[in-house]
């Protein structure tokens, strides 16, 4: 489980609980009783499904407040959508908030986002480098409603003071998941959102605001 306040519910967990070989052998009333109890005991319940296990997905999908789709970035969006036809055709697809998590094996430049958004029209989307611990930690915080955002103000050259502030945040162990800003604060926020460290931002500032002298 992700935290004491949440739980992860899987088909195998239900089978183990009822000592059953197939989820269709479990009486719906008994399964619903179990799921109701789990949802009452925890603030957040994550029902884990896969396209290969249709019966389980159809049982838990009506309970969903949100649908999170974890998809392989190396696949074509149209191909992926075709493979989840039963989900796309479900009532929940039209009525429930959809979140797209696009998984990347490498750490190179992300491209092709527009195709994914056009094909799935999610309410929110994330790009996750699966080998990056920071990415996984950020996603976990979002799943638990613990994301932390930072918005930086403007002020021309005074905005460079944000660098010192970020050094202090780093020293305190604070990690931010969202960045926003206005004027020079937006520029600084964009660099932070790209993962640049304070020292790298100083180099970028010198290149774009001193050497080139805009």
Residue spans for each PLM region:
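Residue-level preference for the first positions of well-ordered beta-strands
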Residues: 7, 44-46, 147-149
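Short internal beta-strands
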Residues: 9, 99-103, 178-180
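TRAFAC-class small GTPase G-domain
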Residues: 11-28, 33, 43, 79
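A short acidic, often aromatic-flanked loop/helix-cap motif at beta-alpha or helix-coil junctions
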Residues: 14-18, 108, 130-138
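Conserved catalytic-core segment of NTP-binding enzymes
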Residues: 31-35, 40-41, 45-131
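Extreme N-terminal, non-catalytic leader segments
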Residues: 122-147
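Patatin-like phospholipase
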Residues: 149-151, 156-214
């Amino acid at each position: 489980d992700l935290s004491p306040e949440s739980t992860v519910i899987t088909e195998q967990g239900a089978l183990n609980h009822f000592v059953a070989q197939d989820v269709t052998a479990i009486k719906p009333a008994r399964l619903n009783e179990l799921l109701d109890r789990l949802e009452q005991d925890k603030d957040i319940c994550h029902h884990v499904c896969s396209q290969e296990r249709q019966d389980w997905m159809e049982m838990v999908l009506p309970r969903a407040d949100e649908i999170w789709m974890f998809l392989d970035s190396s696949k074509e969006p149209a191909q992926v959508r075709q493979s989840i036809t039963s989900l796309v055709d479900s009532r929940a697809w039209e009525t429930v908030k959809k979140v797209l998590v696009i998984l990347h094996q490498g750490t190179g430049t992300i491209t092709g986002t527009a195709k994914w958004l056009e094909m799935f029209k999610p309410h929110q989307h994330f790009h996750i480098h699966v080998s990056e611990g920071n990415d996984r930690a950020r996603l976990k915080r979002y799943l638990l409603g613990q994301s932390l955002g930072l918005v930086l103000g403007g002020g021309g050259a005074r905005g460079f003071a944000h660098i010192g502030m970020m050094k202090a945040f780093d020293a305190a162990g604070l990690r931010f998941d969202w960045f926003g800003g206005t004027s020079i604060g937006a520029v600084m926020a964009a660099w932070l959102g790209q993962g640049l460290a304070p020292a790298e931002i100083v180099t970028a500032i010198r290149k774009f605001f001193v050497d080139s002298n805009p």
